[in-house]
């Protein structure tokens, strides 16, 4: 993303003046899927794709915002109760309101922003937008008195209160706390976190986007949560201390098998194994063992496909193709039923894999997948 591109549009739209420039990244999650609402671990990292915004206080109580990518302009008063109709402007409005709730004296400003986080590919473009404006508001109007953790919560509260999305905190957390060359293991129960080195020399991290989103996603997601809760309730009969599947071992699950439906058992088995895989991948990274990391990614895909049943034909096809091409690791990334696979690919296999993925996928499904190379990068920051 080019600062000068954003600056030129800002100057053109706002009478030749310039302001401060801020950026926040999108994110990937290397492993740890459907573990967040089970009290487990996730393992995200910020990426080199995100949002850049230029912002200048305008001495009024009105925010004047221009989306460069959408060529759309919105104005709103900071004391207005109703959020703007434009969905993208709701994120900025929500962040301003949430910062004000936390005691930051947000004033009116002019802003233009653009992004290179692909929409709908599971890299959290909305979290990048929220983090950009939360960080900027804190810097411009709050003397940076709001800590990073609270900035992530500002983004999450914006989703809940202004955008109707009941999300966890992983996306915003990764966007704010991202660090170049490191992934972040986040404990979704305690919210404690730890950085682990991720600098795979000789490998590339690449997302292959199936460009499909099956309609089942939201109802199926709710059913999976209910399955996990049912399994926990069954285990609690003998182990009342259990709060989440994170507290359950496979032995405990087996012990309660008679009280759990076959489907709920499969769902719980996947989650228990996935939480352990996150820990195994962290251990492997500390040893620089990327082969084990890749193996665990394949295990996750198998679990999401066969036990949690949130994959789809397109994603299974891409995963099988990656394995056949000798790709070190591959799995579906995100909630499932479409979206991307995330792949850990040796440099020397990269061109062959991408060419084959595009050709074979198009032959079978009649359209080409999109491909995104990503590098693990820094979180929200001021650029100029």
What positions do the PLM features span?
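C-terminal nucleotide
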Residues: 1-27, 52-85, 182-329, 344-384
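Short Gly/aromatic-enriched secondary-structure transition segments
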Residues: 39-46, 224-225
């Amino acid at each position: 993303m080019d600062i000068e591109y954003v600056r030129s549009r800002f100057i053109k739209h706002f009478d030749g003046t310039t302001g401060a420039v801020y950026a926040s990244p999108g994110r990937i999650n290397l492993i740890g899927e459907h573990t967040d609402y089970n009290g487990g671990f996730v393992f995200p990292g910020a990426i080199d794709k995100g949002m850049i915004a230029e912002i200048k206080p305008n001495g009024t109580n009105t925010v004047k915002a221009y989306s460069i990518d959408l060529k759309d302009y919105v104005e709103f008063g900071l004391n207005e109760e109703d959020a703007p109709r434009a969905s993208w402007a709701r994120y900025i409005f929500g962040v301003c309101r949430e910062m004000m709730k936390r005691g930051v004296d947000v004033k009116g400003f002019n802003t233009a922003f653009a992004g290179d986080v692909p929409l709908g590919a599971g890299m959290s473009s909305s979290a990048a937008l929220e983090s950009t404006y939360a960080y900027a508001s804190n810097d411009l109007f709050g003397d940076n008195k709001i800590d990073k953790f609270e900035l992530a919560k500002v983004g999450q509260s914006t989703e809940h209160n202004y955008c109707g999305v009941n999300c966890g905190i992983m996306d915003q957390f990764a966007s704010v706390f991202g660090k170049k060359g490191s992934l972040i293991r986040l404990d979704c129960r305690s919210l404690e976190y730890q950085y682990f080195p991720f600098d795979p020399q000789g490998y590339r991290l690449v997302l292959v986007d199936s460009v499909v989103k099956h309609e089942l996603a939201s109802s199926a997601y709710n059913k999976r949560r209910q399955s996990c809760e049912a399994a926990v309730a069954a285990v609690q009969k003998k182990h009342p201390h259990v709060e989440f599947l994170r507290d359950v071992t496979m032995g405990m699950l087996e012990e309660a098998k008679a009280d759990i439906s076959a489907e709920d058992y499969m769902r719980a088995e996947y989650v228990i194994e996935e939480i352990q895989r996150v820990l195994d991948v962290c251990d492997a990274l500390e040893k620089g063992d990327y082969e084990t990391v890749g193996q665990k990614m394949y295990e996750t895909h198998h679990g999401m496909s066969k036990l949690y049943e949130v994959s789809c034909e397109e994603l299974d096809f891409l995963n099988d193709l990656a394995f056949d091409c000798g790709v070190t690791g591959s799995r579906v990334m995100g909630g499932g039923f479409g979206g991307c696979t995330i792949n850990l690919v040796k440099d020397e296999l990269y061109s062959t894999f991408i060419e084959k993925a595009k050709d074979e996928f198009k032959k079978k499904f009649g359209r080409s997948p999109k491909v995104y190379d990503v590098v693990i990068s820094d979180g929200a920051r001021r650029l100029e």
